[in-house]
Amino acid sequence: MKYEIVGDTLPVVICHLNKGEKMISDSGAMAWMDPCMKMETNGGGAGKIIGRMFSGETLFRNSYTANEDGLIAFASSFPGKIVAIDVDPGKEVIIQKSAFLASEENVETSVFFNKKFSSGIFGGEGFILTKVSGHGTCFIEIDGSTVEYNLLPGQQMVIDTGYLAMMDATCKMDIQSVPGLKNKFLGGEVLFLSLIHISEPT
């Protein structure tokens, strides 16, 4: 599969498939495709449907199989960016819930519960996120623009809650309160901030 991401405000990812290749997408994500694409709708079982209910994704997903070489395009549902993520076993990624757009067939998504309850209650990203695993390329949609940082082991970054789009599964998210009453009530910022850090090797 080869792809190109086009457009600025409402981007589209155009995937060029060889015969027999398959793409998976959320319902309603497909924008246009060649007639050689065969569509099938599947929920993936009761467990996966319930998981998608928690993570804010559509309950059913569509698969598109190329009966011949052809293209299929998936469009973002809001202004922002489409980001391509390559995942492999041991290289999983945590993304915003409902950020999944489309992927190759060997990519899997599952509900990811933040282990620290306080991070879910006070963090802008919520208690429930989405974990992307498997093997292949996944496309996610993010509202607004993105800035990427590569943290080293032990390095930390404080982020205004709600601005975290995705992180490697090796990262951990904790929540810290803004110190000082004056800062809390007069600072004009949120009361809680996300602290992202890399886990130390075990």
Feature map (PLM): residue ranges:
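Residue-level detector of conserved catalytic or cofactor/ligand-binding positions
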Residues: 194-202
